[in-house]
Each structure stands twice: as structure tokens, then as C-alpha cells.
Amino acid sequence: MTTRTSLTIVLAAGEGTRMRSSLPKVLHPVAGRPLLAHVLAAAPHGADDKLAVVIGPDHQAVADETKRIRPDAETFVQSERLGTAHAVLAAKQAIARGADELLIAFGDTPLISAETFARLREPLRNGSALVVLGFRAADPTGYGRLVVEGDQLAAIREQADASADELKITLCNAGVMAIDGRIALDVLAQIGNANKKGEYYLTDAVGIMRERGLRASVIETDEDEVRGINTKAQLAEAEAVMQTRLRQAAMTAGVTLISPETIHLAADTRFGKDVTIEQFVVIGPGVSIADGAVIHSFSHIVGASVGSNASVGPYARLRPGTSLGDGAKIGNFVETKAARIDAGAKVNHLTYIGDAHIGEGANIGAGTITCNYDGFNKHRTEIGAGAFIGSNSSLVAPVKIGVGAYVGSGSVVTKNVPDDSLAVERNDQTVRVGWAKRFRETSARARKPKTS
């Protein structure tokens, strides 16, 4: 089959005023990834597929995010908001370069899939000049209705203009569209603004195609996939749908989720085989969990890798830059950041490990702190393989604890400890025999009321 070229234009110029936020609407996250990023990830990616994003003025943050996600993408500014067709023509320069297929999508529909983009293109290869994505709405009120005659799309009728019979139609316009790229620019240029708002509506392209005797088609998807995000409530609804998808995909791949509805995943979370995630775990962006690992309840993991057969939690926090080796253990109330913890090492309780490397098989006692920040700079702590750090120790970085070395409980270590050595830093213990009894007796006498 001959390879066909495509240009996808993603409209992302909306202010999102109903979000009540200074953050551009398309940069709000779902499953740890901006709305726009989900759409760009789903859009065609091949060598013959181009991408353009239309942004609003003063939305440099959106342009920057676009380049981060898809360095190949171009951005164009829609200086005035005069309707969807006007927005598409902001990328006129890209359209004019030519492509077999022009795809138009929206930056606030994070649930759209790559499969839907592929299905949208198929009718163009079979003779259609325009394809509209539709969905069966549970409540079609407010949506444009797709009027179908036989197997062709006859019109998109807005709610205010629909007849009584047309209002009964539940097949609604999702806004996503594909146009034969050879005629796309000519059709878009023909769209006028003779309406109450004086705007240029992309939906008018259907009528133009019909006037030219060209075929317009509809493909359907489920309503969830084309949810647009305009409010924080809709953002939360999309998050819920996305989480259900991610959990289902994880379980299908063999991950055990205990009470899946309580577990939060990120869009880019990667799992190995036979992973178990207990209740109330939050996994943020940039996390990979290898075969056989167990994440216990109430743990929070972001930007970290967990090795095979490792154990995390309960009540553990793994921050960005944490790398947990095979069979290593992070226990309850432990926080790690920018830390490499090698295979078999144990950090079991009440500990902070930051900017550190813990060698294979080392044991870190309860209450140990790596003191990594001096108020200006971060410093590293190196703990050798097989080392033992006693409870309630403070390791003042930069410092190195050698292979097989011991640190006595309660020590404040400020100097390097050689291999197989013992470091103890604390005052000699003083014992005063009978002192406690005398103290109680003296205190009791002092509390007796004085007689007048």
C-alpha cells in the first residue's frame, strides 16, 4: 500500500477561563501528563506525519511544552479567536506545504487514542473527502447533531438550529475531523462567517463538501474518549476515566492491584511481571517497577525505578532520582531522593536518604539521616557494600562509609570511615546509682502543701 502523508493540527489556543487558573488549560495534568501531551502522544508519529499546534498569544509555556513532547512539531499563534476554522487557518503555512490527509484535533481531549486517529484516516483512503468523529451521547443537549443519510454525513446541526426530529438524534459531533489534504486549504478558505457571532466554523466544511458533490463520512467512538475539559470538575472526570484505563491495562498485563480503585497510576508507569501494588498507593510520572516487586500501602513514588523483587513501604516516599536495586527494601516512614540503593540493601524504618549511594547488602538502621544540605549546596553520602549503620545516626555529607564498615547507634559522622572499621561518635555514658529514687523523693516532698 502506498504510504500517505498527514498533517495533524491540534487546536490549543483556548484561554480556559472556566478552569479559574493561571495555568493554560491544555497544561493541566491528567495521570501526571498535561492534557496536550496525551493528544500529541496519540497523534500520528511516522516519518511521513507532520504536526502543528495552534496556541494563543502569550502562551509561550504551551509552545515550550509542545517542543518538549514533540520536537518535530511546529507552533502557530491564533492572534484572534474567531472560530475553529479560523484557528485551523492559523497553521495555513503548514497546510500549504501539502499532505494527503489533514487531521484536526483539540488539545483538551486527553482520552483520544492513536487507534481513533488511525480509524479517522481510513475513510479518506476509501473515497471520502471529509470524516467527522462522532459519539452517542447519553444526554445530547448542547451538542451538534450529526445528520446521516444512508452511509454519508449530510449535515452537522447545532442545537439551536435543529428540528424536532433532529433533536432526537443522539449521534453527536466530537469536533475531531479529517479532510482530504489536496483540497483542505481551498475548503477552509471558503468557510464564511455569516452567523450571529461572526465566527468561522469548521463544521461548515460539511456543507461545502456536499455542495461540491464530495463524500462526507462519520466514524464513531465512545463518549469518554472525546471528553473536552473546560472545568476542574471535568478535569476530575477525565482523571477518573484515565485511571480506570491505566488500572485495567496494568491488570491485563499481569500486575496485581489490591483494591484497584484506591491506586493512582501515571500515564507512563512501566511494570514488570508479577508486580503487586497494595491499597492507597500513588505512583507519579517517571516510575518503573520491575518483576516481582511489591509496593505496600500508602506509599508515594515519583521519578524512581524499583528493582525486581524489591519491597517498598508501607508509608514510604520515593522521590525523583531514586533507584532501588533488586531485592532491596525500603520500609515504613522512609524517604529517598536522588539515591541509588543497590541490590539487597535495607532501609527499614524512619529514615531519610538523599543524594546518596548505598552499596549492595548494606543495612541502614532506624532513624538514620543523610545530612545532605548545608543551606546552599547538596552533598553526597557514600555507603559501601555490606556496611551497617546503627539506629539514630546522622551522616553529615560529604562523607564516605567504607565497605563492611560499622557506625555505632546515635553517632554523628562527619569524617570518612575506612573499610571494615567501626565509627562511634557520642559522649561516654554516665550512670548515677540511686539518683532517680532520690529525685522522686525530693520532688514529692517539694509538692506537699505547707502548713500555716
UniProtKB/Swiss-Prot annotation:
Cellular component terms (Gene Ontology): cytoplasm; membrane
Chief subcellular location: cytoplasm
Subcellular location field: Cytoplasm
Glycosyltransferase in keyword set: no
Catalytic activity: alpha-D-glucosamine 1-phosphate + acetyl-CoA = N-acetyl-alpha-D-glucosamine 1-phosphate + CoA + H(+); N-acetyl-alpha-D-glucosamine 1-phosphate + UTP + H(+) = UDP-N-acetyl-alpha-D-glucosamine + diphosphate
Co-factor requirement: Mg(2+)
EC number: 2.7.7.23, 2.3.1.157
Chain's role: Catalyzes the last two sequential reactions in the de novo biosynthetic pathway for UDP-N-acetylglucosamine (UDP-GlcNAc). The C-terminal domain catalyzes the transfer of acetyl group from acetyl coenzyme A to glucosamine-1-phosphate (GlcN-1-P) to produce N-acetylglucosamine-1-phosphate (GlcNAc-1-P), which is converted into UDP-GlcNAc by the transfer of uridine 5-monophosphate (from uridine 5-triphosphate), a reaction catalyzed by the N-terminal domain.
Name of the featured protein: Bifunctional protein GlmU
